[in-house]
UniProtKB/Swiss-Prot annotation:
Subunit structure: Part of the 30S ribosomal subunit. Forms a tight complex with proteins S10 and S14.
Keywords of the record: Ribonucleoprotein, Ribosomal protein, RNA-binding, rRNA-binding
GO molecular function: mRNA binding; rRNA binding; structural constituent of ribosome
Top-level lineage group: Bacteria
Name of the featured protein: Small ribosomal subunit protein uS3
Keyword Acyltransferase in record: no
Source organism of the structure: Aeromonas hydrophila subsp. hydrophila (strain ATCC 7966 / DSM 30187 / BCRC 13018 / CCUG 14551 / JCM 1027 / KCTC 2358 / NCIMB 9240 / NCTC 8049)
């Protein structure tokens, strides 16, 4: 049988950036890697209700900079920034170096693979029919400009005795085109019948400039909108 390579792994350095970017000598590499794992595990557990998309980690000059990509930044920041300050102290204690936390808002959660997968799992845990949850996710993604989306669920669907896999696709999802921007994510729904796995592939279009173009587009998206100049008022003066 044909097997599928991990869509994010095969595109690393081509259209996908790394989630951890730092350099370390042989002595410190394992410690840094384990520290990253612990930080991600802690933040995922603490922010399970904050629509967490991904966590990126950088280590400039004996410190750690964590960027939390979330659809609900208000939940992460908390009242007057209290919650984010608690997180910063906890991350500094785990990593053993001074920590800085940045919050990045995900503007279109319907086009984020991880958030779509988590949305489907939460619906399955609330006993929503799996076909309805899949179809709703696909329709929302296509409505907001996705070029294609595929959703796959597998397990004891609807409480069936025998586990099976069902999938639904709309549009194009070219997994072998390296310049294709494919957002792939997985999630698990813990139901009374057992665990149901959810996989999501979202095709957002082709990237022609490589990783530099991806980074430039991300920076442009995160930049705050400039206020429009009021030409009428200036003319009146």
């Amino acid at each position: 049988m044909g097997q599928k390579v991990h869509p994010n792994g095969i595109r690393l350095g081509i259209t996908k950036p790394w989630n951890s970017t730092w350099f370390a000598n042989t002595k410190d590499f394992a410690d840094n890697l384990y520290s990253d794992f612990q930080v991600r595990q802690f933040l995922t557990k603490e922010l399970k209700n904050a629509s967490l998309s991904k966590i990126t980690i950088e280590r400039p000059a004996k410190s750690i900079r964590v960027t939390i990509h979330t659809a609900r930044p208000g939940v992460v920041i908390g009242k007057k920034g209290e919650d984010v300050e608690k997180l910063r102290k906890a991350v500094a204690a785990i990593a053993g170096v001074p920590a800085q936390i940045n919050i990045s808002e995900v503007r279109k959660p319907e086009l984020d693979g991880k958030l779509v997968a988590d949305s489907i799992t939460s619906q399955l845990e609330r006993r929503v029919m799996f076909r309805r949850a899949m179809k709703r996710a696909v329709q929302n993604a296509m409505r907001l400009g996705a070029k294609g989306i595929k959703v796959e669920v597998s397990g004891r669907l609807g409480g069936a005795e025998i586990a099976r896999t069902e999938w639904y696709r709309e549009g194009r999802v070219p997994l072998h085109t390296l310049r294709a921007d494919i957002d792939y994510a997985t999630s698990e729904a813990h139901t009374t019948y057992g665990v149901i796995g959810v996989k999501v592939w979202i095709f957002k279009g082709e990237v022609l400039g490589g990783l530099a173009a991806v980074n430039a587009a991300a920076a442009q998206e995160q930049a705050p909108a400039k206020p429009k100049r009021d030409n009428k008022r200036r003319a009146a003066k």
